[in-house]
């Protein structure tokens, strides 16, 4: 597994996968310092200096980046031909990845607000999966079930509605 992004989602998701037995090999971030901080929390990960992963041993590439960066990174990233490209956004459709050089596209959406210094039990975080191929579905469902007890398949339109409702509920609760 390789991560693109080192923000709040990556800060929690990468160690959860590492602890579940998925080796996180590389972390790329616009900020190499932030990538280095994340790799310190992982067993074998190294900082990656560019989006050229053509020689990577990873088979899963997770874009844990801002919504507006997904499409640009999907267009620029170079990954092995059969690799799976995943984004973690609740509001962006899987089609944001369509310009990538792979057909194995997926979304892994954790229904959770993440803060770097907040401890989270990932087993209780609901994960929602959407994929374009059977192979991506098989791999992503296995990955998701290894870190969460609540895994469901969901389409982009349903995921966006769920995300909007969750944001509304969270903001309403915070406002009270």
Predicted regions and their residues:
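Short phosphate-binding/catalytic loops that engage adenosine nucleotides
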Residues: 22-23, 103, 149
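Rossmann-like NAD(P)(H) cofactor-binding subdomain of soluble oxidoreductases
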Residues: 32, 42, 46-119, 140
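Internal alpha-helical scaffold of NAD(P)-dependent oxidoreductase catalytic cores
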Residues: 34, 38-41, 119-164, 169-176
């Amino acid at each position: 597994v390789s991560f693109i992004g080192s923000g709040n989602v990556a800060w929690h998701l990468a160690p959860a996968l590492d602890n579940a037995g998925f080796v996180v090999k590389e972390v790329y971030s616009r900020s190499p310092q932030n990538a280095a901080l994340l790799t310190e929390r992982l067993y074998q990960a190294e900082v990656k200096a560019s989006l050229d992963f053509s020689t990577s041993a990873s088979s899963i590439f997770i874009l844990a980046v801002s919504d507006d960066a997904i499409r640009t990174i999907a267009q620029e990233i170079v990954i092995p031909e059969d690799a799976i490209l995943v984004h973690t956004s609740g509001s962006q459709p899987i089609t944001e990845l369509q310009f990538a050089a792979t057909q194995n596209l997926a979304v892994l959406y954790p229904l959770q607000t993440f803060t770097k210094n907040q401890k989270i039990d990932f087993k209780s975080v609901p994960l929602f999966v959407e994929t374009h191929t059977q192979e991506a579905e098989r791999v992503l469902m296995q990955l998701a079930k290894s870190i969460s007890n609540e895994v469901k398949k969901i389409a982009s339109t349903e995921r966006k509605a769920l995300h909007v409702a969750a944001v509304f509920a969270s903001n309403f609760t915070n406002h009270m």
